[in-house]
């Protein structure tokens, strides 16, 4: 008789079977895939022994495509169909891309994309999600060939600043590439894991991540295997590409040469990148580029490069200062600084970071590989291969989330820099008598007025039982999952009617917009407080006028003529103040006058209600 084999829930029937899980760093300039093999995390090479995959895809006529090194080599002769730095376009609309005129691509807003941009290529219209999926699929095939096995799943890293739309676009790309996505984790968290900071490390660490397209700074607190991201910051207009552009522009000014065609611009940009990389190892390099049919040559010294790019380096340190201030951490409290991203190889950057923090940064791991290695370690644990090494990762929300309330005010539900995953709820009520539906507008930002924040989603809760204004209790719950994606639910407590929405905006906030919104929030805090006070006073006054008029319509006959006239005059005065005054105190004073002037009326209404309730009843019945 055969026996049924029953394994522990969630475990493989074969205790010796190991699931293959990978970590992927989907980067702006290069992408990598890593995995844990024989207990050691390592980046997986291609057939030629190269671990870096250029994040470049070239589309050919007839549906063909080239990916990686082959595509990168074609940038000079076919820039319009060779897509690089696609990470900058993920989850974004046409209006979000600055300097479009300097890029060789034909951007369009596809009719079925919900506002997300696409690119017109020789192989048809391609979205950034599709381009990223080509890169992810190439890395997936590399991993499958390396292990000669199917993959259990993947952890993919994203910048800490990525918003809902950008994270969702990354998840969509993973799905399109045939990957089982185990988790999205923030790049600085992955870097900290790679450095082994989970192995008993305690204290505050900073992760300085200067990649090809963006700069991110994160402050983490480590305690007994718990990774808590205290604060994040950055600058989306700052990366290795911007150092290249600054050097290229300076050389063009020095030589008097102008690059006008897409081919010339690409030639100058690639020459600047090669010059920058060479200056990492030597003090003097010849800048060489073909422009307008002629060869341009110019000697560049390391000190020239440092002077030309000094403003960019200082911008990164300004973002570091803001983030430390958000975290309420002094720079001397930082126990260690982790460098991430190929651009941190620049001596000028390393020297500036060391001077700022007063300590040499951690550089013993390859800055190009550190994020992928950390993702691989996390993937290995999520696959159940290293149960003893479980980590608790606490990432944060970059901007506050809330809903619109009466008067166009924002009521924050989840605050900026709160750890995720999280769920928070708050009760709201109706504004008018008999209201049976509630419109819920979800917004993101630090300002007090809806018009100054970013709209994320709208939905309606219908079927609310008719009640007096303020009687209904609607609980609104915000839930942010471990990938940083938001869902919102609204439930009327008495009837149980419920509505919910997964917030998937067609495109979202750029890092630059997040930084700008934070700066505006700080700069206008006093003004916002005054505006909010005025709006709240006006909403309260309107509610008082509605309630008073409703009471007069029902029980106005209990008033003497003089009493009715006095109340009418107070109501008229309050309406006049609402129409003419922008002073919250004046509105509050007029509303208080009406409230005080109707106290006797309220007492008379209560007496009438009591008499009506007692009518026809004797003492024994009571």
Curated annotation (Swiss-Prot):
Record's keyword annotation contains Chaperone: yes
GO BP terms: iron-sulfur cluster assembly
Keyword Ribosomal protein included in the entry's annotation: no
Annotated signal sequence range: none
Highest taxon of the lineage: Bacteria
Pfam families documented for this protein: HSP70
InterPro entries named among the record's database cross-references: ATPase_NBD, Heat_shock_70_CS, HSP70_C_sf, HSP70_peptide-bd_sf, Hsp_70_fam, ISC_FeS_clus_asmbl_HscA
Keywords: ATP-binding, Chaperone, Nucleotide-binding
GO MF annotation: an example: ATP hydrolysis activity
Functional note: Chaperone involved in the maturation of iron-sulfur cluster-containing proteins. Has a low intrinsic ATPase activity which is markedly stimulated by HscB.
Family, as annotated: Belongs to the heat shock protein 70 family.
Protein name according to UniProt: Chaperone protein HscA homolog
């Amino acid at each position: 008789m055969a026996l049924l084999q029953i394994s522990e829930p969630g475990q493989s029937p074969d205790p010796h079977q190991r699931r293959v899980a990978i970590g992927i760093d989907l980067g702006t300039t290069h992408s990598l895939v890593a995995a844990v093999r024989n207990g050691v995390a390592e980046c997986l090479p291609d057939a030629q022994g190269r671990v870096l995959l250029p994040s470049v895809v070239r589309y050919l006529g007839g549906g063909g495509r080239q990916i990686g090194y082959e595509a990168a080599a074609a940038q000079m002769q076919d820039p319009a169909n060779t897509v690089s730095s696609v990470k900058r376009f993920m989850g974004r609309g046409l209006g979000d891309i600055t300097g479009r005129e300097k890029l060789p691509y034909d951007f369009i807003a596809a009719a079925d994309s919900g506002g997300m941009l696409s690119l017109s290529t020789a192989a048809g219209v391609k979205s950034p999600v599709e381009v990223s999926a080509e890169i992810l699929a190439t890395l997936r095939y590399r991993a499958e060939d390396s292990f000669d096995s199917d993959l259990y799943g993947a952890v993919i890293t994203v910048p800490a600043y990525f918003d809902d739309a950008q994270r969702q676009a990354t998840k969509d790309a993973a799905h399109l590439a045939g990957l089982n996505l185990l988790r999205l984790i923030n790049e600085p968290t992955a870097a900290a894991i790679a450095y082994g900071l989970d192995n008993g490390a305690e204290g505050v660490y900073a992760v300085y991540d200067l990649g090809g397209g963006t700069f991110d700074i994160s402050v983490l607190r480590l305690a007994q295997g718990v990774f808590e991201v205290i604060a994040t910051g950055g600058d989306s207009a700052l990366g290795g590409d911007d150092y290249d552009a600054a050097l290229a522009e300076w050389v063009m000014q020095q030589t008097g040469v102008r690059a006008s065609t897409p081919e010339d611009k690409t030639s100058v940009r690639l020459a600047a990148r090669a010059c920058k990389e060479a200056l990492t190892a030597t003090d003097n390099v010849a800048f060489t580029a073909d422009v307008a049919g002629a060869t341009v040559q110019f000697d560049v010294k390391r000190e020239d490069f440092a002077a030309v790019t000094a403003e960019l380096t200082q911008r990164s340190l300004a973002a570091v200062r803001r983030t430390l201030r958000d975290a309420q951490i002094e720079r001397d409290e930082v126990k260690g600084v982790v460098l991430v991203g190929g651009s941190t190889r620049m001596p000028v950057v390393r020297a500036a970071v060391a001077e700022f923090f007063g300590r040499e940064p951690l550089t013993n791991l390859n800055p190009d590989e550190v994020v992928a290695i950390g993702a691989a370690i996390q993937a290995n644990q999520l696959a159940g291969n290293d149960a003893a090494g479980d980590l608790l990762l606490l990432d944060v929300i970059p901007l506050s989330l809330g809903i619109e309330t009466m008067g166009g005010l924002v009521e924050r539900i989840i605050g900026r820099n709160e750890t995720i995953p999280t769920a928070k709820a708050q009760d709201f009520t109706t504004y008018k008598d008999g209201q049976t539906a509630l419109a819920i507008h979800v917004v993101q930002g630090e300002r007090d007025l809806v018009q100054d924040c970013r709209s994320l989603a709208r939905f309606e809760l219908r079927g609310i039982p008719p009640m007096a204004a303020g009687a209904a209790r609607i609980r609104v719950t915000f839930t942010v999952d471990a990938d940083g994606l938001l869902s919102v639910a609204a439930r009327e407590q008495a009837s149980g009617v419920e509505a919910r929405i997964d917030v998937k905006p067609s495109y979202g906030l750029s890092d630059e917009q997040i930084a700008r919104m934070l700066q505006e929030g700080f700069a206008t805090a006093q003004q916002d407080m005054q505006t909010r006070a005025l709006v709240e006073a006006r909403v309260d006054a309107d509610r008082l006028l509605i309630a008073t008029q409703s009471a007069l319509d029902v029980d106005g006959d209990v008033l003497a003529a003089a009493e009715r006239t006095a109340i009418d005059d107070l109501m008229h005065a309050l309406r006049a103040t609402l129409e003419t005054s922008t002073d919250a105190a004046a509105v509050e004073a007029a509303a208080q006058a009406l409230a005080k002037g109707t106290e006797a009326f309220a007492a008379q209404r209560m007496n009438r209600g009591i008499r009506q309730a007692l009518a026809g009843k004797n003492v024994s019945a009571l």
